[in-house]
Amino acid sequence: MHTSTEARMGMRAALTGFAVLMLLQSCSAYKLVCYFTSWSQYREGVGSFLPDAIQPFLCTHIIYSFANISSDNMLSTWEWNDESNYDKLNKLKTRNTNLKTLLSVGGWKFGEKRFSEIASNTERRTAFVRSVAPFLRSYGFDGLDLAWLYPRLRDKQYFSTLIKELNAEFTKEVQPGREKLLLSAALSAGKVAIDTGYDIAQIAQHLDFINLMTYDFHGVWRQITGHHSPLFQGQKDTRFDRYSNVNYAVQYMIRLGAQASKLLMGIPTFGKSFTLASSENQLGAPISGEGLPGRFTKEAGTLAYYEICDFLKGAEVHRLSNEKVPFATKGNQWVGYEDKESVKNKVGFLKEKKLAGAMVWALDLDDFQGTCQPKEFFPLTNAIKDALA
């Protein structure tokens, strides 16, 4: 009797241990993909950011933005010191052997025209595709991220072909003891851009994961204040605005054939700001233009989280109950941004939808110096990481 009780207790303990292990594995299965921008090194003073400032256990994947494509259609560096920064980034893997690094090619400055020229021409496309794996391997990267912003209607099939051929090349390039290179793409979350440039069902099957840019939904073109990354539709949203939220974009992508298990929800560490046109300062108030540039980022209409912390001193803070995001006003300035509460709500949503995880744009726009709260580094990214656990 005594022996069977012990056996049962032992079995129960083993099962409990197994359950805990399975839980840990399922929790750790979430990806936290974080972008780093090479131009952040040029910001003044405490705004300057280099890859060695990244905490090696913060993200599961780090994406270096951006690489270039040379005149002979080969993957190439962009900045004068990219090679040195590639080395700094990939050295983080000596401290965290599970960390994966990817190189993103393209971006806003690169433009859609050059991508179109390469993807639409078989000879150019083949040259580019064949150049990628040797380049990534030589610098120690684990994969490529495509940031074609954004394919036009005529490019839709070329974009699919480019992704398909890159995936085939990565499969062909695998050798014993060497993992297949990862392939991801940064996709717009705007309905018009999705409908115009992406065959979602086709590209999703060839990508390891999709970085859905669920931000920049609202801008100065609307001529009124609005949050650029609302989780849900707002009560006052017009017919067009009903598409401009995280919830709609995620569900739409899944409806079009993207597997939830490959979809990463983009969470911004930056805020979008506006200059108010009158004393009215609530959601939907008229604006005269973009907000004032930040002290370090120096870009009208955009503020890093560490600049927002400074703005919040003496500001009036509001929380949008439907959209689940905050905004703040001070004088004639209006800023929609993320905080720890809003990012936790977003992680709760992505878990509910069984998404692959979260993507962060960008590490250098989070409070990496710990200026908001002393010795609290990367507060938004860490809040996302904690909520994913």
Swiss-Prot record:
Glycans are attached at residue 68. Residues 333-347 are annotated as: Important for AKT1 activation and IL8 production. It holds the Pfam family Glyco_hydro_18. One of its GO terms (biological process) is positive regulation of interleukin-8 production. Keywords: Antimicrobial, Apoptosis, Cytoplasm, Disulfide bond, Endoplasmic reticulum, Glycoprotein, Inflammatory response, Secreted, Signal. Chitin binds at residues 79-80, 106-109, 150, 213-216, 361. Induction: Up-regulated in colon under several inflammatory conditions. Up-regulated upon pulmonary inflammation elicited by sensitization and challenge with the chitin-free aeroallergen ovalbumin or with chitin-containing antigen house dust mite (HDM) extract. Up-regulated in lungs after S.pneumoniae infection. Up-regulated in splenic cells of mammary tumor-bearing animals. Down-regulated by hyperoxia in lung. It is found in: Secreted, Extracellular space; Cytoplasm; Endoplasmic reticulum. SMART domains: Glyco_18. Residues 30-389 form the GH18 domain. The keyword Cytoplasm applies. Disulfide bonds join 34-59, 309-372. GO terms for molecular function: chitin binding. Detected in lung in pulmonary macrophages and alveolar type 2 cells and in bronchoalveolar lavage (BAL) fluids. Expressed in mammary tumor cells (at protein level). Expressed in lung. Not detected in non-inflammatory colon. One of its GO terms (cellular component) is cytoplasm. Residues 1-29 form the signal peptide. Disruption phenotype: Mice are viable, fertile and appear normal, but have defective antigen-induced Th2 inflammatory responses and defective IL-13-induced responses, displaying accelerated cell death responses and diminished M2 macrophage differentiation. Mutant mice are more sensitive to S.pneumoniae infection, displaying enhanced mortality, exacerbated lung injury and decreased bacterial clearance compared to wild-type mice. Mutant mice also have an exacerbated response to hyperoxia, displaying enhanced protein leak, tissue inflammation and chemokine production and premature death. It comes from the Eukaryota. Gene3D superfamilies: 3.10.50.10, Glycosidases (3.20.20.80). Monomer. Carbohydrate-binding lectin with a preference for chitin. Has no chitinase activity. May play a role in tissue remodeling and in the capacity of cells to respond to and cope with changes in their environment. Plays a role in T-helper cell type 2 (Th2) inflammatory response and IL-13-induced inflammation, regulating allergen sensitization, inflammatory cell apoptosis, dendritic cell accumulation and M2 macrophage differentiation. Facilitates invasion of pathogenic enteric bacteria into colonic mucosa and lymphoid organs. PANTHER family: CHITINASE (PTHR11177), CHITINASE-3-LIKE PROTEIN 1 (PTHR11177:SF202). Belongs to the glycosyl hydrolase 18 family. This is Chitinase-3-like protein 1. It comes from Mus musculus (Mouse).
